[in-house]
Amino acid sequence: MSCQDYVDKQLLASRCVTKAAIAGHDGNLWAKSEGFEVSKEELTKLVQGFEEQDILTSSGVTLAGNRYIYLSGTDRVIRAKLGKVGVHCMKTTQAVVVSLYEDPIQPQQAASVVEKLGDYLVSCGY
């Protein structure tokens, strides 16, 4: 499967994710959902935030021009929210899976779908 297939057939098809992208650690976009215009700068800062959560705590998580409030994170997962829209991101060996979900989808539902794909990508060396 291509990265675009993972976005379309794994993340969006689950109906637990409303927008998604997969990018390399360098911020280069590998695939994205239609209308999700996330920039290389936003992705680069997000990837940096996995190691340095302080930058996200102070300035939030910006995706497609929208600034989300950073909720929590580890070296593997980042969570943020703005109003009724949540963010769940997972870092793999070579990539980052970025997702947005909206009410009434629960955070755990989006997390499950994103992390299942992330774990699969890790098992494949990505």
Curated annotation (Swiss-Prot):
Pfam families attached to this UniProt entry: Profilin
A GO molecular-function term, please? actin monomer binding
Q: InterPro entries under this entry? A: PFN, PFN_euk, PFN_sf
Keyword Cytoplasm: yes or no? Answer: yes
- Keyword Cytoplasm present in the record's keywords: the answer is yes
Q: Where in the cell is it found?
A: Cytoplasm, Cytoskeleton
Give any Gene Ontology cellular component: cytoskeleton
For this protein, the record's SUPFAM superfamilies field holds: Profilin (actin-binding protein)
Domain of life according to the entry: Eukaryota
UniProtKB keywords: Actin-binding, Cytoplasm, Cytoskeleton
- Similarity comment: family membership: Belongs to the profilin family.
Description of how the protein assembles with itself and partners: Occurs in many kinds of cells as a complex with monomeric actin in a 1:1 ratio.
Function recorded in the entry:
Binds to actin and affects the structure of the cytoskeleton. At high concentrations, profilin prevents the polymerization of actin, whereas it enhances it at low concentrations. By binding to PIP2, it inhibits the formation of IP3 and DG.
In Swiss-Prot or TrEMBL terms, this protein is called Profilin
User: Which species is this UniProt entry from?
Assistant: Apis mellifera (Honeybee)
